[in-house]
């Protein structure tokens, strides 16, 4: 269920989030959990825009993905972008379960652990139960990827 948590603090009538959401907060709502939760913090939600971060330092993927040449995998960037759009949908009080229906991605440069933090910024468009994000992914202060996830909110 989408809104089964007492920490659900989103309010669609507000122009901005009342607080920051950290990994612990996000794990209490309907999202992937454990290692598959890619978003570490939501910094702001204002109208159709959402801004979040994920930490690279100590991320579980680096020892496993090209251990001697660690590069953050594009599939996890796509997952993070989908989670970002789903979080915005919850903020807008869309009821149902989010499902990634389609995605396009353009990877511009590799992301490595020394860059410290990945920043995700998105502008959202919504039409009925379909939510589309235009997500820009920054690492080391530079644009690293552009991802366009399309999330369908499936009614319960």
Model-derived features with residue positions:
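Flexible, low-complexity linker/boundary loops enriched in proline and small hydrophobic residues
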Residues: 2-43, 50, 151
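Hydrophobic beta-strand-centered segment that forms part of the acyl-chain substrate-binding groove
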Residues: 11-12, 17-20, 84-119, 124-126, ...
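Catalytic strand-loop segment that frames the active site of acyl-thioester-processing enzymes
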Residues: 33-72
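Intrinsic-disorder/low-complexity, polar/charged segments enriched in Ser/Thr/Lys/Arg/Asp/Glu/Gln
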Residues: 37, 47-51, 117-119, 130-132, ...
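Compact, glycine-rich, soluble single-domain proteins
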Residues: 64-86
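Flexible glycine-rich active-site/ligand-binding loops centered on an Asp-His dyad
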Residues: 72, 142-156
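Core beta-strand residues in small-molecule sensory/regulatory alpha/beta domains
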Residues: 136-138
């Amino acid at each position: 269920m989408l809104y089964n948590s007492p920490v659900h603090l989103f309010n669609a009538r507000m122009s901005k989030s009342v607080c920051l959401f950290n990994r612990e907060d996000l794990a209490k709502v309907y999202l992937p959990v454990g290692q598959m939760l890619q978003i570490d913090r939501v910094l702001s939600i204002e109208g159709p825009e959402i801004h979040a971060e994920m930490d690279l330092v100590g991320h579980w993927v680096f020892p496993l993905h090209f251990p001697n040449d660690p590069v953050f995998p594009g599939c996890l960037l796509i997952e993070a972008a989908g989670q970002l759009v789903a979080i915005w949908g919850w903020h807008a009080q869309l009821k149902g379960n989010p499902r990634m229906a389609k995605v396009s991605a353009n990877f511009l440069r590799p992301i490595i652990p020394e860059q410290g933090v990945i920043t995700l910024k998105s502008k959202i468009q919504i039409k009925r139960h379909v939510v589309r994000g235009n997500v820009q992914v920054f690492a080391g202060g530079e644009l690293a990827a552009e991802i366009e996830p399309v999330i369908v909110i499936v009614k319960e």
